[in-house]
Amino acid sequence: MNQGYAELHCLSNFSFQRGASSALELFQRAKKHGYQALAITDECTLAGIVRAWQAAKSVELPLIIGSEIRIENGPKLVLLVENIEGYQALCGLITQARRRTQKGQYQILREDFSEPLPGLLVLWVPEAVDEVEEGRWLKQTFGERLWLAVQLHRGQNDQQRLAALLSLADELQIPAVASGDVHMHARGRRALQDTMTAIRHHVPVAEAGLRLHPNGERHLRSLDVLRELYPQTLLDESLKLARRCTFDLGELRYQYPKELVPEEHSASSWLRHLTEQGIAWRWPKGAQPKVLKQIDDELELIAELGYESYFLTVHDVVRFAREQKILCQGRGSAANSAVCFALGITEIDPDRTTLLFERFMSRERNEPPDIDVDFEHERREEVLQYVFRRYGRRRAALTAVVSTYHASGAIRDVAKALGLPPDQINALADCCGHWSDETPPVERLREGGFDPESPLLHRVLSLTGQLIGFPRHLSQHPGGFVISEQPLDTLVPVENAAMADRTIIQWDKDDLDAVGLLKVDILALGMLSAIRRCFDLLRRHRHQDLSLATIPPEDRPTYDMISRADTIGVFQIESRAQMSMLPRLRPQTFYDLVIEVAIVRPGPIQGGMVHPYLRRRNKEEEETYPSPELEVVLKRTLGVPLFQEQVMQIAIVAADYSPGEADQLRRSMAAWKRHGGLEPHKERLAAGMKKNGYSPEFAAQIFEQIKGFGSYGFPESHAASFALLTYASCWLKCHEPAAFACALINSWPMGFYSPDQILQDARRHHLQIRPVDVRASDWDCSLEPIAGEQPAIRMGLRMIKGFREEDARSIEKARARGAFADVADLGERAGLDSRAQALLADAGALRGLAGHRHRARWEVAGVQKQLGLFAGLPSQEEPDVLLPTPSVSEDLFTDYATLGTTLGPHPLTLLRNELRARRCRSSRDLLEVEHGRPVSVAGLVTGRQRPGTASGVTFVTLEDEFGNVNVVVWRDLAERQRQVLVGSQLLKVDGRWEREGEVRHLIAGRLSDLTPLLNGIRVQSRDFH
């Protein structure tokens, strides 16, 4: 008698809010029970199938690929893939079902089965035992490929149900098979499954009723239990089906697009031709021999691995962007490639940098290289639509991102499902929103008014812990495109994205890596938009024709500005953590900037590399090298490994790793905190280094640094790509501050700083800011010349909250035909409605036509009255009404309410006497305060950051009328005074002043909320980004 069984109907947690176990948990349990195979049949999706495939391989248990579907007004079926034709048919069916309805839903019709779907086996899951007519239709449609699924879950009438189903199968002459309708790997997940069901139906568990399964039997049961429930023939039948389902994802064969290659060329010869053209463009006087050899080596490897079409595809996208004058730049590991530089994809000159091509691609890697290209964020859509036009929507789609449950969302969903009232849900999420450890934050709960011993609270937290990390839904990748020669839905299902004119495949980037599909990342970067806008402004107003390539390099005033941490608004080094590092590192060259970009990251910090590097840079510590070979690797960073490439090179040079093995080490570094896998490298490194004469202490030190890189260390090539934009933005801020500030505001939202902070910084740099004025303002902020000085910034109509761009464009067109005589003339010629005119009046934009705000609002109201019932009739002259001029504080309040900023006095100027009475010093006063002295400071909160580099420390930026103050809030104080920390707009800090050279900050000891002093003024703060 055959003792085995194959489960043919099983949901993973990629049946969102239904399946209560991961694929790995399911396969591990199935292997433990002695199953012969396991089908993963998530509902109308293959989103989790690659993970299931990897889980199956990890336990050496066959995976059967399938999907549960429900026909509209019809039966529930389970479709199982027999071979590659069946896989393609299933992908096409899911695509059709998902594309014909909105995101997150599907629709399958009986007509979808009018044509045969070869290679699919069909299980029918009847809801009643007398569905004879339904069975006849299914038999006629699927014939010999149809089975009746018998599902027994220890209900009161299992035996009667079994007999009736077998009788139905016999009557219809359909073979019957045992199946479990599995929703979880173990019975212990029942509470989570019930909770997820309640979440899905938007009801509390207590009211879910028959929506819940009656017991916990929908788990992977032991063979002994199954033999008690089912006749052996039904269990044996499961094995017959399993033996027929032989398809493996490894059989998929992806083909690159071919239309980019002219008929007279092969892909290889065409790539070489384009590269040679690029060499002539990049190096008009000829490239160095080492660069030409690097290019030849790369082209040889690209041809050997068959990736020519990938490079041609990326080149084509970049070519289109450059022709449309869209700024773009490749980054990431692709910047290690000399071929990418020659093709114009990246901007890191291999003649000036040490490249590690193996970081980008190597013979040992089992997937294509990954090229990321940033485009202007405002024009990226043009590039995306070009790709769709070029390849068609059947051959191009965006990659999915699997959105997973984090603590805050999981707590809210679980607490709501368990019936907690909204105020308690909010308080609980506030207490535990950043909870990541297995142990609940008991003290936080007590502070929030909760009893940690409460059984209900314990249940909420237990279920939350199980739910964290579960997939919640698929969302759209920011710009990862999959492009293929064959229709994509022969490889993976495609569905609608939430955004119009977008389609996404059901796999994410990790899935693509696993099965070897090409992905091109077409990403958006706000700083590229700002730089392009700045170039446009300089061309229009300053008659300068600049580009990224023509910005003067190695400019001393620019580096001096950077070393002072005068970097508000620039790229990458604008955060408080970066600003605090700049006066310590004091960059003097481009390579210093590369290091600056990379060093303020969790990897170098947690690997203990930052302080040794700074000490060596400041000649406080001697440079030492374990060997001459490693000196070559580490010399450029003073003997301290700061980059991923250096760690890989150390493994190659000191421990005899091959380049491909070094790349596997990099991957293990990136994933060890989530998945482990570094320990084998520890032994291998130690053995290899010992063999080559390195001490055990050095091997242990390197391994600890490698673990630090598991917390996000930068590749050098990526840091160099970003440093190019860092330098460009800094040069523009230093030499063309008005155009740069203007471009930043016009490109907002982007970066760390609000328009208000950018304008306040511009004023501190003695730039003239002119108010919004319908007589001069365009939609965007603009420049107005001042003889012999930096131009003034004219605030644009975009600054007015709620004002429409189309109204601004109407004003521009009307003004081009002649100046406005008064408010009525403006309203009539620009076609403005009452709402638009009121917004202009409140924002002070009618000052030049009507006087102050009160008078402007009065005139707008009068114009509307004339345009109302009495339009066209003679109007009586109304005497002038004496309206009071707004006070300074009234103007200040209305400025912030309508514009988010003010050109009047800073709010703290008006409060300075009150703050002095509270013993608060200004940021200017602090310049004279000695290190270690106790001080009190108050300011508007413009930023709160809790970076991963900081071990729970929160950095707060306070702004007053003279500048900014950096505040450090240690974790214990942040926990004790959390409400004040996160809720204050005007914050007083009592603490200890610290200064070391140009590095200054306040260590907080006590926080006080002074927000009521603002009388309702609201200031924007960038929090926890």
Swiss-Prot record:
Keywords: Cytoplasm, DNA damage, DNA repair, DNA replication, DNA-directed DNA polymerase, Nucleotidyltransferase, Transferase. InterPro entries: DNA_pol3_alpha_NTPase_dom (IPR011708), DNA_pol3_finger (IPR040982), DnaE2 (IPR023073), DnaE2/DnaE/PolC (IPR004805), DNAPol_HHH (IPR029460), NA-bd_OB_tRNA (IPR004365), PHP_dom (IPR004013), Pol/His_phosphatase_N (IPR003141). One of its GO terms (biological process) is DNA repair. Its EC number is 2.7.7.7. It catalyses: DNA(n) + a 2'-deoxyribonucleoside 5'-triphosphate = DNA(n+1) + diphosphate. Gene3D superfamilies: 1.10.150.870, Metal-dependent hydrolases (3.20.20.140). It holds the Pfam family PHP. One of its GO terms (cellular component) is cytoplasm. SUPFAM superfamilies: PHP domain-like. It is found in: Cytoplasm. GO terms for molecular function: 3'-5' exonuclease activity; DNA-directed DNA polymerase activity; nucleic acid binding. DNA polymerase involved in damage-induced mutagenesis and translesion synthesis (TLS). It is not the major replicative DNA polymerase. Belongs to the DNA polymerase type-C family. DnaE2 subfamily. PANTHER family: DNA POLYMERASE III SUBUNIT ALPHA (PTHR32294), ERROR-PRONE DNA POLYMERASE (PTHR32294:SF4). This is Error-prone DNA polymerase. It comes from Pseudomonas fluorescens (strain Pf0-1).
